[in-house]
Regions:
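Conserved C-terminal guanine-recognition region of P-loop GTPase G domains, centered on the G4
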Residues: 28-37, 68-73, 84-99, 244-246, ...
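Flexible beta-alpha connector loops of hexameric P-loop NTPases
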Residues: 17-23, 53-57, 115-120, 159-160, ...
Length: 418
């Protein structure tokens, strides 16, 4: 998509059977946000009801003609469908429209490509793009491959498609190796962070203000520009919790309704940061429409990833946009504002308690000259009692598994327990 020119696009919303908790109108509004985030200019849109999806076009023949006519009238350069089109459907629609046909996945990929900043992020986007292109490549060359089968009847089109397939699959192999190397480095970095103390991951629906809240919690003066999928690469900063305890706070990629599985897989490195965290802060935009549906989308995604059982806190961000005296729309959520700082101290306290949910108690006897280790206990755990006896320091407290592993040499087996 030509992002710099504000390419005019026509959007097609669809009311399909079994679409889920989002209404077609809401989903179309979100598609419009995605298009604008990709640098496009929405010149028009329509909402179609599809009782029985057409295998050839997804929509009915008459509906397709109406879409093509309206897109041409508005001089749209591309038509974007709020669904995942099959390669055959995309090709047939392009033939009728004589202009680009994109689906929801292609649009999200375009946004991802625009916002990927790190080498790892760019590699993951490139891999997802090739994975998306491969089945469409087959359909693109389908006419050439129908030149007949058998020896002596294979046409040049069949040779070309096989060559293109090989090149793309070879590129996938290269990308996979590069991503795996970066993934290994990130794994080492995670292990080092675990040694340093608590880790907390911010998750949430895209554009919920995760990056702004991350900056506010960590004292960063530049929260960045609010936009969909502003963060594709995990960002790690240090934050201080009540009592002087330190935590590493990780900003992660946002979720979205009907996020294609191939994109979830492409960003597994980002999601591994959530998996390794001691606690999760689920950030939601309290002023956004359909707040409950957005929260449910994130919770459902976490469940699919096997992360629903992690200790978590629900932070209802952008509370400064609520009317005075207006109560939280979701029970159990904490009202905060990254912009004004309201509620951040209470949130820090809740983060500390959530992260400590799986801590273990310890009772250790340290050498007298253990200043560095004591400081480590203070920053990444909690000290309940400290006594100096002769040339020894007796410490009772609690902490995360990484800290207790460090302290085992100073304790008898029964003195470290859950």
């Amino acid at each position: 998509m030509n992002r710099e020119s504000g390419e005019p696009v026509f959007l097609v919303g669809l009311e399909l059977p079994g679409r889920g908790i989002w209404t077609p109108k809401d989903s179309l509004a979100e598609l419009s946000e995605l298009a604008e985030s990709a640098g496009a200019r929405v010149c028009g849109q329509t909402l179609l009801r599809v009782r029985r999806p057409n295998p050839a076009l997804l929509i009915g023949t008459g509906q397709a003609e109406e879409v093509v006519t309206e897109a041409a009238r508005l001089r749209a350069q591309a038509i974007v469908f709020d669904a995942e089109l099959q390669p055959r459907q995309q090709r047939n629609l392009e033939r009728r429209a004589r202009r680009k046909i994109l689906d929801r996945t292609a649009l999200i990929l375009d946004v991802f490509a625009r916002h990927a900043g790190s080498a790892e992020g760019k590699l993951q986007v490139a891999r997802a793009q090739i994975d998306y292109l491969l089945p469409r490549l087959s359909d693109l060359w389908v006419q050439f491959s129908r030149t007949g089968g058998g020896i002596g009847t294979r046409g040049p089109g069949e040779t070309q498609i096989e060559r293109d397939r090989r090149e793309l699959r070879a590129r996938l192999s290269v990308l996979d190796r590069q991503i795996e190397r970066l993934r290994s480095r990130r794994s080492i970095a995670r292990a080092q962070r675990a040694e340093a103390g608590l880790t907390v991951a911010l998750v949430g629906y895209t554009n919920a203000g995760k990056t702004s809240l991350h900056a506010a919690l960590c004292g960063d003066a530049d929260p960045g520009e609010p936009r969909m999928f502003a963060t594709l690469d995990p960002k790690v900063r240090r934050a201080e919790l009540p009592g002087g305890q330190l935590a590493l706070v990780i900003d992660t990629v946002g979720f979205i309704n009907r996020l294609p599985p191939r994109l979830v897989a492409a960003f597994r490195a980002t999601l591994e940061e959530v998996e390794s965290a001691d606690a999760i802060v689920h950030v939601a935009d309290v002023s956004a429409p359909h707040l409950t549906e957005r929260v449910e989308t994130v919770v459902s995604t976490l469940e699919d990833l096997g992360l629903a059982d992690k200790p978590s806190v629900l932070a209802l961000n952008k509370a400064d946009r609520l009317r005075a005296g207006e109560s939280p729309p979701l029970p159990g959520g904490m009202l905060v504002s990254a912009r004004t700082g309201a509620g951040l101290d209470v949130l820090r306290d809740a983060i500390g308690k959530a992260a400590a949910a799986d801590w273990q108690q310890f009772d250790v006897e340290l050498p007298y000259r253990s200043g560095a280790l004591l400081e480590r206990i203070r920053s990444s755990g909690r000290i309940a009692r400290l006594r100096y006896v002769g040339d020894r320091v007796l410490v009772q407290g609690s902490g995360p598994p990484a800290l207790l592993n460090r302290l085992r040499r100073y304790a008898s087996p029964e003195s470290i327990h859950t």
